Amino acid sequence: MGDHYGFSLTTFSPSGKLMQIEYALNAVKNGQPSVGLRAKDGVVLATENVGSVLTDDQPKVEQISKHIGCVYSGMGPDFRILVKKARKIAMEYEMMYGEEMPTIQLVTDIAAVMQEYTQSGGVRPFGASLLIAGWDKNPGRPLLFQCDPSGAYFAWKATALGKNDVNAKTFLEKRFSEALELDDGIHTALLTLRESFDVGMNENNVEVAVCNSTGFHRLTKQQVHDHLGTL
């Protein structure tokens, strides 16, 4: 009977859980760590991306629209599907209304897609959680959200996903300040990421991006190298 609850997507267990969602969240917890931090003048996303020397780079940080981008922990193929859907949603909104989609509206639409995959036949939940960074022009503020496989979403000042996320969040609670500016935010995000790293951090296994009033930008390897040199 226990197997029935574990394999069924739409049947609650006696304890009130949908086990396939629990398993999807485990995929996130076993994923490479990611950190998001909201500074006064922008948002920082940082993540571990350890690949093979034999393969081309597979970025974990992706741009969705001019002022919105995201990073993930969990399963890469699932993330790429979500990014494709998010870009389509953002593009359709911009074509219809002639302006960039507000961050919160994109977050709610993507969360609705993820939730739909928890109660539909023939599919499974997405095995990835997203950290979505955005800058809304009106009233001109940075935003950071998390979307989970269940379809739940949260607004954060700072948070972490993936391996050792509890230690990373504890570190953020000690170091985060509302007064942080973007450069200090990058420094704090990298220090937090180091809490979860199994190997030495360098520009080849770390990705960093920022989102501010000028848009969403991925830092170059040289810029990442320079920031790591200040830790």
UniProtKB/Swiss-Prot annotation:
One of its GO terms (cellular component) is cytoplasm. Transmembrane segments: none annotated. It is found in: Cytoplasm; Nucleus. Its main location: cytoplasm. One of its GO terms (molecular function) is identical protein binding. PROSITE patterns: PROTEASOME_ALPHA_1 (PS00388), PROTEASOME_ALPHA_2 (PS51475). The keyword Nucleus applies. GO terms for biological process: proteasome-mediated ubiquitin-dependent protein catabolic process. Pfam families: Proteasome, Proteasome_A_N. It comes from the Eukaryota. SMART domains: Proteasome_A_N. Keywords: Cytoplasm, Nucleus, Proteasome. The 26S proteasome consists of a 20S proteasome core and two 19S regulatory subunits. The 20S proteasome core is composed of 28 subunits that are arranged in four stacked rings, resulting in a barrel-shaped structure. The two end rings are each formed by seven alpha subunits, and the two central rings are each formed by seven beta subunits. The catalytic chamber with the active sites is on the inside of the barrel. Belongs to the peptidase T1A family. The proteasome is a multicatalytic proteinase complex which is characterized by its ability to cleave peptides with Arg, Phe, Tyr, Leu, and Glu adjacent to the leaving group at neutral or slightly basic pH. The proteasome has an ATP-dependent proteolytic activity. This is Proteasome subunit alpha type-2. It comes from Caenorhabditis elegans. The lineage of its organism: Eukaryota, Metazoa, Ecdysozoa, Nematoda, Chromadorea.
